[in-house]
UniProtKB/Swiss-Prot annotation:
Entry binding sites for ATP: G130, K131, G132, S133, R382, D396
One cellular-component annotation, GO: mitochondrial matrix
UniProt organism field: Saccharomyces cerevisiae (strain ATCC 204508 / S288c) (Baker's yeast)
Subcellular location(s) per record: Mitochondrion; Mitochondrion inner membrane; Mitochondrion matrix; Cytoplasm
Disruption phenotype: Methionine auxotroph. Undetectable levels of folylpolyglutamate synthase activity. Increased rate of loss of mitochondrial DNA. Respiration-deficient. MET7 and FOL3 double mutant cells are not viable even in the presence of methionine and folinic acid. MET7, FOL3 and TUP1 triple disruption mutant is able to germinate on YPGA medium containing thymidylate and to grow although poorly on synthetic medium containing methionine, adenine and thymidylate. Adenine and thymidine auxotroph when grown in the presence of sulfanilamide.
Name recorded for this polypeptide: Folylpolyglutamate synthase
Binding site for Mg(2+) 2: H262
NCBIfam families: folC
GO biological process, any: one-carbon metabolic process
Top-level lineage group: Eukaryota
Co-factor requirement: a monovalent cation
Keywords carried by this UniProt record: ATP-binding, Cytoplasm, Ligase, Magnesium, Membrane, Metal-binding, Mitochondrion, Mitochondrion inner membrane, Nucleotide-binding, One-carbon metabolism
């Protein structure tokens, strides 16, 4: 850049992020009626609009190309940064009641009403543990009926290696070309339309919905343009105020196992969390849930179902699945697979493909196509086993207490009889990492003792850069650079393990992989867990090595 020349795109991005931070932290903006009565605020926004119209702070990204990389760059600009997330947490305001109203408005601006999404014949899935796996199972079952349902959409989060994984058709991520095409169709429609600031004070000219909301809009647009006959939607967080809850008439809803997670948004108790999850229930759409839910949570789910004038049915593990090798490993997946069977059954019966619904009984007879769908389900990063050279990698992106216990138990059972060296590769940057490590340790001990334990950041490359699809602004960059979390984890591990394992800290996933390759000449079993960011980054590192 020439000396003295201003970097307008960076200035603009900085201005917009700071403006957003002001809005998020200002009480008046959470209450539109207060905004209407404040002349100073109204004048400020009129002036801001004037600046936008002069192209001084107009979105700079509309002037760049429209490749897949451009789309990813534009999408990453919509992430909330760490400071904003912390500010929202500190306010203690868990209910942004404008969220769904804004989703309806964003939809209008790209040419849709919520009723347009009804044609997608949606399965809507929430829960704390296993909702992504259940969504994948359901999609795979429906995919066995290609003659009647030639295109099945699947919307899940987060992604592992590529953001395209979030929007799938017939189980495969949409192509880079289609992602870019549909992305910029949505982006440009938002640029060419405006909203009433009286009704939507957050939606200033040139602004966009946040990262997840934008992807939700993009998924609807993609699935409609691709003429999908049925779609499976996984909730992002919670349910009641999740952006996917713009879905007005799902065919069926599912709730996987409940647990404590995302407490700053959903509440600190299982009752509060269940209330949020039950927010996806709709009149006329039957709801199903797994057995052995926490009793307090199940009570709330039943109350929510009654309130929404629908039914809630507990699904037992089907005996017919006991000897079936599911496409996603782990004994606990039998419950998710059973739930998926009931969800798919509702869709297929409603579509006049199945004459009779499958009975919700442990002794029910499950059609062969359902079994094939469950066996063929592919879902990377969940109880995944990879052989790389002399080593065997056991990979699971567990990041909650319950999922960590399940994943650690799976690893313990898989390697209990193995005589190989045992290595743990762990990362968790934003949750209570030490508590997760304690859950892991208690689940594998005393049967499994690790020889080496490596704590890494979620940075992909040793150059300090991330794979473009894995850029995350949701963690403290200072903590990442100073390895604060990793050093804390080392102290905690040495304490609970009585200094038996050798502990290591790496600044990137690539360095962690290189370290593992040099630790031993003999084979090793490596357990990779703690976050999906770690799992995704490691798979990207593997891909680069395979290409070489």
């Amino acid at each position: 850049m020439h000396k003295g020349k201003k970097n307008y795109p960076n200035l603009i991005t900085s201005f917009r992020m700071n403006l957003k931070k002001i809005i998020l932290n200002h009480d008046r903006f959470s209450h539109p009626e207060r905004w209407k009565t404040n002349a100073l605020l109204r004048f400020t926004f009129v002036y801001i609009k004037f600046l936008f119209d002069l192209m001084i702070i107009k979105n700079p990204l509309r002037m760049v190309g429209k490749t897949y990389r451009d789309a990813v760059t534009a999408l990453n600009s919509l992430q909330s940064n760490y400071a904003n997330i912390m500010a929202i947490r500190q306010t203690g305001d868990r209910k942004n009641t404008m969220t769904l109203l804004e989703m309806h408005e964003w939809s209008r601006r790209i040419g849709y009403s919520a009723s347009d999404f009804n044609k997608l014949n949606i399965v809507h899935i929430t829960g704390t543990k296993g909702k992504g796996s259940t969504a994948a199972f359901t999609s795979s079952i429906l995919g066995q009926y290609k003659e009647q349902l030639p295109r099945i959409g699947l919307y899940t989060s987060p992604h592992l290696k590529s953001v395209r994984e979030r929007i799938r058709i017939n189980g495969e991520p949409i192509s880079e070309e289609k992602f870019a095409k549909y992305f910029f169709e949505v982006w440009d429609r938002l640029d060419s339309t405006t909203s009433s600031l009286d009704k939507f004070p957050h939606m200033i000219p040139g602004s966009k919905p946040g990262y997840f909301k934008f992807l939700t809009l993009l998924s609807f647009h993609t699935f409609i343009q691709e003429d999908c006959k049925s779609c499976v939607y996984e909730v992002g967080v919670g349910g009641e105020l999740d952006s996917t809850n713009i879905i007005e008439k799902p065919i069926v809803c599912g709730v996987t196992l409940l647990g404590i997670d995302h407490t700053f948004m959903l509440g600190d108790t299982i009752e509060e969390i269940a209330w949020n999850k039950g927010g996806i229930f709709k009149s006329g759409a039957p709801a199903f849930t797994v057995e052995k839910q926490p009793p307090q949570g199940l009570t709330i789910l039943k109350e929510r179902a009654e309130e929404r004038k629908t039914t809630l049915t507990e699904v037992p593990p089907f005996k017919q699945l006991e000897n079936v090798k599911l496409g996603i490993a782990g004994e606990f997946q039998k419950s998710n697979a059973s739930l998926a069977v009931m969800l798919a059954s509702e869709i297929l019966h409603t579509s006049n493909i199945l004459e009779e619904k499958i009975k919700c009984s442990s002794n029910a007879s499950i059609p062969e196509k359902f079994i094939i769908g469950l066996q063929n389900t592919k879902w990377e990063g969940r109880c995944q086993v990879l052989e790389k050279g002399k080593n065997v990698w056991y990979i699971d992106g567990a990041h909650t207490k319950d999922s960590m216990v399940a994943a650690s138990t799976w690893f313990r059972d898989m390697v209990r009889l193995s005589k190989r060296k045992k290595i743990l590769l762990f990362n968790q940057q934003s949750r209570d990492a030490n508590a997760l490590v304690n859950n892991l340790y208690s689940s594998v001990s005393p049967e499994i003792t690790f020889d080496d334990v490596i704590f890494t950041t979620n940075v992909t490359w040793k150059s300090g850069s991330y794979s473009a699809d894995l850029v995350s602004m949701n963690t403290s960059q200072e903590d990442v650079e100073k390895l604060k979390v990793q050093e804390s984890l080392v102290k905690n591990w040495n304490k609970i393990d009585d200094n038996r394992a050798k502990t290591h800290v790496t600044a990137s996933i690539e360095e962690a992989n290189e370290l593992i390759e040099t630790l031993y000449d003999e084979p090793a079993d490596i357990f990779v867990t703690g976050s999906l960011h770690l799992v995704g980054g490691l798979l990207v590192v593997f891909d680069r090595i395979d290409v070489k």
